[in-house]
Regions:
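A conserved acidic beta->alpha catalytic loop
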Residues: 47-56, 106
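N-proximal low-complexity "stem/linker" segments adjacent to membrane-targeting elements
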Residues: 2-33
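Conserved donor nucleotide-binding strand/loop of the catalytic core
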Residues: 55-94
Length: 119
């Protein structure tokens, strides 16, 4: 079961999907790093019921980035691959033209997002 907290209202044709499980140490920094890029991205966090409070941090940030930051909370630890699939389905249903996957631990550099978008 998933919960949608906000609808896609701000204009952006590019979505960054960030799957999470116990990423409270990284999630705020990665979200802020994506939002500091010159290109206007939306972010979808797909959280697998993190017991460390990752989703609580994201929900607080949603008030700072309304209609740009979204969260889908899944009830169990379903894995990275299914989190990305969930995110892609969410993005396609909302007609995003560009969908970028990014891990919360900075193994993908947020600065590279604009290069992918300009490809």
């Amino acid at each position: 079961m998933c919960f949608l907290l906000h609808e896609n209202l701000f204009m952006s044709d590019a979505l960054v999907i960030i799957p999470t499980y116990n990423e409270k140490e990284n999630i705020e920094a990665i979200i802020r790093a994506v939002f500091t890029q010159k290109k206007s991205f939306h972010i979808l966090v797909v959280d697998d019921n993190s017991p460390d409070g990752t989703s609580v941090i994201v929900e607080k940030l949603i008030s700072e980035f309304p209609n740009q930051l979204f969260i889908e909370k899944r009830l169990g630890k379903n894995g990275l691959g299914t989190a990305y699939i969930h995110g892609f389905k969410w993005a396609l249903a909302r007609k995003y033209e560009y969908i970028i996957e990014m891990d919360a631990d900075f193994s993908h550099n947020p600065k590279d997002s604009k290069n992918i978008y300009n490809f």
